Amino acid sequence: MYDSNNIFAKIIRGEIPSRKIVENEYAISFYDVNPMCDKHALVVPRGEYENILDFARRASAAEQAGFWDCFVKTADALGVDGEFNVFANAGADAPLFNQSVFHFHLHLIAGHKTAACMDIMKDMLCIK
C-alpha cells in the first residue's frame, strides 16, 4: 500500500525542499542527496505509484507522456547525451539494490563517479 508520507510525496507537495531541475504537471526531477556521480538526478511522477510496474500498469497515457517528457528535459538540463545509466529499484528485497523510498522514481546518472559510487561498486564486486 502506498504511503503518502514518503519523502518524495513530501517533496512533490513542497513540504521538504529539494534542488529541482525540471517539473511539469505530471512529474518532477531533482538532484539526489547522495549522488553516485556528479550528474545524479531522480525523476519522479507526481501520482501515487509504488514502483515501476505499478506506474506502467496504472498511470494514464498523459501521466506516462509527462513523466518521459520530464525525463528527457532533465537529461537535457544536465547535459546528458550518450553515456549514462538509468535504473529503478522495486521492493525492499530487490536483488541488487533495495528500494528505500516506495514511490516510483528513476535514477539518471552520468558524469564522474563519486567516492560513494566507488564504494558501492566495490561492495557489489566483493572487493575489500
Located regions from the model:
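HIT superfamily nucleotide-processing domains
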Residues: M1-K128
